[in-house]
Amino acid sequence: MSNSNEQDNRTLTLQRIIDAPVAIVWEAWTQPDHIAHWWGPKGMKTKVIEHNFKAGGSWKYTMEMPNGAEFISEGVFSEIVPLEKIVTSAEFKPMTTGVQLQALFEAQGEKTVFTFNVVHPTEEYCKQQEQMGFMNGWGSVFNNLEDYVTSLIK
C-alpha cells in the first residue's frame, strides 16, 4: 500500500497557464486530429495510430524524429472526467516505461490551468527520468500544445 508521500516522491509535475479556454485545451487532448499537431517534442512528427478515448480504451502514437527514427508511445485510459482530468498508463519505448500520466484541466476565466503529473513506479526511476531531461522534453511538448491551441482561437 502506498501513501501520498510515497507517490509524491515518485511524481514529476509540470504546470502552466494556457491562454485558451478549457474546452479548447480539452479538445486538443482528446481529438486525434488535434493530437497529431502538438504531441511530441519540437521537431518530431506524430501519427495517431489508435485513440479509443474512454476508460479502458487504448491509445498508440508514433513519433518520428528528424533523422527518421521512430518511437512508439502507448497506453490505456483509466479515468476520464470531461473537461477536468485524464489518467492513463503510458509507455514511451525505449526511454520510459510503466508510468501513469495525469492531465488536469482547470478553467480560470478564458484561460486554462494545466497540470501534468507523471507517476513513476519507483522513486529511483523518477529521479532517473528527471535527470534524463523530463522537464525539457515535456516542456517542449506543452510549448507545442500551447502554440497549437492559441492558434485555434485566433
Report the location of each language-model feature:
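Hydrophobic ligand-binding cavity/cleft-lining segments
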Residues: 1-45
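Intrinsic-disorder/low-complexity, polar/charged segments enriched in Ser/Thr/Lys/Arg/Asp/Glu/Gln
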Residues: 9-15, 22, 46, 58, ...
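A structural signal for short, well-ordered beta-strand segments
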Residues: 14-16, 103, 116-118, 138
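Hydrophobic pocket/interface hotspot
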Residues: 25, 35, 59-61, 77, ...
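A solvent-exposed, acidic/Ser-Thr-rich amphipathic alpha-helical stretch
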Residues: 32, 41-56, 61
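Hydrophobic-ligand binding "helix-grip"
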Residues: 36, 42, 50, 64-109, ...
